[in-house]
């Protein structure tokens, strides 16, 4: 019913937000059958009207499609850049990964850091986690900075990112790149384990089994 209503409204207004919403519903099969090809067409329409969410979704579909031509991939990169410039955090994160890995563009760690930071400040936990990992590893273009890594990993963990929670737990347990804090480490590893993170479950199991840092349970 909602889907039919959106279609009717769109026919009257040709509104980019409605076009994006229809595309999203078709992509996820919400209120209608799942239809990726139709979703892509709606995202195309909304994209032409500069809807950043549609630009991001469309770029993502093109990148994930093995039959995409180099020309389509270049257009997808253009759309993703536009969406990132418009402040879409998922686009900023996706574009950051492209520059970090040098996928179809020249590798640019500084640009990746700038994009990840923009997305992270919008509470994108994956971007914050990516920043934490970059600062922890260091690179020719980015000096290793354990304090910055700890800051971003903590932020991502607080946002509920299980991968950051696991990484932070390990960091606090080892006490090399961050002050050792077994209590906090167990708290973060438990939070990750409760989200089904197998690495965290294994690390906790090992801790309790050996009973070195914690009393045997």
Model-derived features with residue positions:
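N-terminal leader/linker segments that initiate helical-solenoid repeat arrays
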Residues: 1-5, 10-13, 17
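Short, intrinsically disordered, charge-balanced linker/junction segments flanking boundaries
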Residues: 1-3, 208-217
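Short helix-capping/linker turns of helical repeat alpha-solenoids
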Residues: 12-15, 28-30, 48-52, 64-66, ...
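Hydrophobic face of amphipathic alpha-helices that form TPR/SEL1-like repeat modules
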Residues: 5, 19-28, 57-65, 94-101, ...
């Amino acid at each position: 019913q909602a889907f039919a209503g959106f279609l009717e409204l769109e026919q009257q207004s040709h509104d980019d937000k409605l076009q994006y919403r229809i595309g999203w519903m078709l992509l996820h099969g919400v209120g209608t059958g799942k239809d990726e090809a139709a979703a892509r067409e709606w995202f195309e329409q909304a994209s032409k009207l500069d809807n950043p969410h549609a630009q991001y979704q469309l770029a993502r579909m093109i990148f994930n499609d093995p039959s995409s031509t180099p020309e389509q991939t270049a257009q997808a990169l253009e759309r993703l850049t536009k969406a990132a410039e418009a402040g879409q955090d998922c686009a900023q994160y996706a574009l950051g990964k492209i520059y970090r890995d040098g996928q179809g563009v020249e590798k640019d760690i500084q640009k990746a850091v700038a994009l990840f930071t923009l997305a992270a400040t919008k509470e994108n936990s994956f971007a914050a986690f990516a920043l934490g990992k970059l600062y922890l590893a260091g690179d020719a273009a980015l000096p290793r900075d354990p304090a910055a890594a700890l800051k971003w990993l903590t932020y991502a963990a607080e946002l509920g990112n299980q991968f950051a929670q696991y990484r932070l737990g390990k960091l606090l347990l080892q006490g090399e790149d961050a002050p050792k804090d077994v209590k906090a480490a167990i708290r973060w590893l438990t939070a990750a384990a409760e989200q089904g993170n197998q690495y965290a479950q294994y690390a906790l199991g090992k801790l309790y089994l050996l009973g070195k840092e914690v009393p045997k349970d």
